[in-house]
Amino acid sequence: MLPKDPFILLSVVNTKLRDQYSSLDKLCDDLDESKEQIVQALADVGYTYSPEQNQFV
């Protein structure tokens, strides 16, 4: 289960993307999390997913 706080979520997701997953889709599939919910939660605080960097920036 991922954290609800968007800034903690940002840190956790970016760390996992950097260290364990080659894409947001793979992270979401493996953790059984909604990609849309993660993207929206982080968009609400000004971050978007960059596939080229495999990070939310």
Language-model segments: which ranges?
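Short, charge-rich amphipathic interface segments used for partner binding and complex assembly
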Residues: 32-57
